[in-house]
């Protein structure tokens, strides 16, 4: 039987096992549990499982659960340990697929979609905190990108695997997703760091930490929380309305719409690894600035182009954003916050900020979309504006800090006498 040990022994193999387990967790709980639902929506309505209004109501369950899970993740881990909590959450997400194969009632379905969201939020808070401390410092960005590659694979799978499963039937599609999740849960089961290995890493972190009370979080950390929230606002329109924009907004065929969604999935696969690589080589702050600039331009470009090749290119760039910003934000926290425990707290707060604004944005965009007669351009303009504000805020804080530092270094007239 395969067991996990501290990665300092035959170490490198164990590190990759930990990363593989993290990838499986993000794939099951977010990649599939959230994004595989989108292509199932027409079939849920067409098969008369639920009405169109009920399906929209059920769509919110996962986002609400994600926020609950982000808040509950660390308290659960404090009772069960990180490894046991991650296994439990993967089982919960897997069970939700099988449960949703039987639409007993709206309450039943909503409850299981809510539980799948709770699993996703808890895993997002815990998975990096469980795996990354075992990774060499020079590879943390790339490793976090590999972990959250699962989100991108889930987005891509929503455009490829789900249509195949739907050809077998709606109930079979849910069961098929459950079987895939069960397989991934089994693959990851023994890949998590052992309790002894985690204890050793935590002890080393405590030994290397500065004595005294933890330092309060500085302005740059709170800026990151705000940026991460604005990123959530910026990614929702493409994530929810992209295919509808291409097919109904631009008059393209359903086939073109499906191809565009596949391109979004390609970007989602590339994003975590590329962004993690950038974090390792450019630093997290510079990488975030670069990504925000490129994303703001790409999202704004959706409003301006009617060329399908250019649209496909923009969609690849935009698709890299939802899963790619996770390793970037995580790397920025590691730059700003000392100590493993404080980093976990900061990451949990960042995830809660993201989850809150993602849920609010999803509701807000729906209100705007219904209020303006179903025009998509305004949604993408708001999204581009939110991303631009995140970039401007970062540059603004840097300028303020630079002026403050210059003022402190300038000697007063009395000091020169």
Predicted segments with their positions:
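Helix-breaking motifs and short loop linkers at transmembrane-helix boundaries and internal kinks
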Residues: 49, 81, 102-108, 251, ...
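Intracellular juxtamembrane helix-capping segments at the cytosolic ends
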Residues: 122-135, 324-338
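Cytoplasmic helix-loop-helix junction between adjacent transmembrane helices
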Residues: 112-150
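Helix-loop-helix hairpin linking two adjacent transmembrane segments in secondary transporters
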Residues: 145-193
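Paired small-residue
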Residues: 107-115, 309-317
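A late C-terminal transmembrane helix in Major Facilitator Superfamily
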Residues: 340-372
